A protein has these predicted regions:
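N-terminal basic/disordered segments at the start of proteins
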Residues: 1-26
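N-terminal glycine-rich anion-binding loops that anchor highly charged ligand groups
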Residues: 24-35, 39, 69
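Conserved ATP-binding/catalytic motifs of P-loop helicase motor domains
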Residues: 74
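Helical "lid/coupling" subdomains associated with nucleotide-phosphate turnover
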Residues: 3, 17-20, 40-71, 81-125, ...
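A short acidic Gly-Thr/Ser loop motif
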Residues: 7-12, 129-135, 196-200, 280-282
Length: 310
């Protein structure tokens, strides 16, 4: 069955069109656009008009593509920014009405579970690290946790200067360590780490020296802790305008990559990981599997949800 999965993330809006058969997900098309849906949500607790407009413009393009490719089911999953926003459910209802997608607002636990489904089978000694714009999930065979350690959220809280000052970076690192120490379950231990999502894949691309992003080279790359520290030091020293011009880094990710790199450095230190394996399979692939299990749409049915938003 051909399906479409959409990830309404805090920093990016992503599309995967895939053929799902017997639990296997074969990519047909994959798109990513930085829309910063979570901009301002941490302080205002609302999705704001401009980010909503960016997402809607993106979804208009995505719907055109998934329809042209013949997707039979479409599932849009929403994570941290929509969870935190008081108008989040109304926003999803409006998307269902406007675009015809089935939507799901995921809890942190559900987000972790869907990410794990997307990554695929992992060993008992493996922890999956998912650093998003609004949250970071650590997912092990025994324990798992969803934290409010997101690259957008922490950039807005801590990194006001351009480039960030040492004091700001230190305060950010202390905050990350405190959350990890307080919230990581005791049974969440790892000999091996798998990293997913844009912060980690971007750092992998920089470590590989890619001028243009190549998912085939990024997937499976072992990103060492020394490489994370080196890229963080390099990126944090650059003003935003120069960071946007770094070869291999998507310009619109430049504002939040420093906070994301701090989170990764501290997570690896906390878990005792000397390296992390980078994966291109993530929550999108889990959402594709979930989309394949949706019932067939009924012609003329109105989608559920609230239809007035924001």
């Amino acid at each position: 069955m051909r399906v479409a999965a959409i990830d309404l993330g805090t920093n990016t809006t992503r599309l995967l069109v895939a053929d799902v058969l017997n639990g296997d997900v074969a990519e047909v098309s994959r798109r990513t656009r930085i829309t910063r849906l979570g901009e301002g949500v941490d302080s205002r607790r609302r999705l704001l008009p401009l980010p909503i407009a960016r997402v809607r413009n993106c979804l208009t393009d995505y719907r055109r593509e998934l329809e042209s490719l013949g997707a039979e089911r479409s599932l849009a999953v929403a994570t941290s920014a929509v969870r935190d926003a008081e108008n989040g459910e109304a926003f999803l209802g409006e998307l269902e009405w406007s675009y015809g997608f089935t939507t799901r607002l995921l809890t942190g636990e559900e987000e972790a579970e869907l990410t794990l489904r997307g990554v695929g089978k992992t060993g008992d000694d493996t922890v999956v690290v998912d650093i998003g714009g609004g949250s970071t999930e650590l997912i092990g065979a025994q324990g798992r946790v969803s934290t409010e350690l997101g690259s957008v959220r922490l950039t807005e809280r801590f990194l006001a200067s351009d480039p960030p000052t040492e004091d700001e970076l230190d305060a950010l690192a202390v905050a990350v360590r405190s959350v990890l120490a307080e919230q990581t379950p005791e049974d969440l231990t790892a000999q091996h780490g798998i990293g997913v999502a844009g912060t980690i894949t971007s750092l992998a691309a920089l470590d590989l020296g890619l001028v243009e992003y190549d998912p085939d080279r990024v997937h499976g790359h072992r990103l060492g802790d020394s490489a994370v520290r080196a890229q963080l030091e390099r990126l944090a020293a650059l003003p935003l305008a120069e960071r946007r011009r770094v070869p291999g880094l998507e310009p619109e990710r430049a504002p939040v990559i420093v906070a994301g790199a701090v989170i990764l450095r501290e997570v690896m230190r906390h878990l005792g990981l000397r390296a992390i394996e980078v994966s291109e399979r993530d929550i999108l692939h889990g959402a594709a599997l979930a989309a394949a299990a949706l019932p067939a749409p009924v012609e003329g049915d109105a989608p559920p949800g609230a239809y007035t938003c924001c």
